[in-house]
Amino acid sequence: MTPPIVVHPPSASGERRVTAHTELLGLARSAQDVFALLLGVGLKEQEIQLDDPALIEWRGGGPEEWRPAPGG
């Protein structure tokens, strides 16, 4: 089963799209931004574990990867 939250690879500007079941939640420039977006959609602080693969699928690098995509 695919995790409900997907953090997409960094764009040319370094931002990463964050989606929930194909719905765009917003753009993140840091792991803290991802955390804030998840709080904003109703998750409780204690429910959010950024390294939990059952909750979040990180594409193009994990929560430490925020460098712009090549060619940007």
Can you annotate each of these PLM segments?
Residues M1-H21:
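Short aromatic-glycine-(Arg/Gly/Cys) micro-motifs in beta-strand/loop hairpins
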Residues I5-V7, R29-S30, A69:
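Mixed-charge, polar/low-complexity N-terminal
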Residues R16, A28, G62-E64:
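Compositionally biased, intrinsically disordered low-complexity regions
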Residues H21-R29:
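A short, exposed loop/beta-hairpin motif centered on an aromatic-Gly-Thr core
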Residues R29-G42:
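A short, charged, amphipathic alpha-helix used as a generic interaction element across diverse proteins
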Residues G40-G72:
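Mixed-charge, Lys/Arg-enriched low-complexity segments
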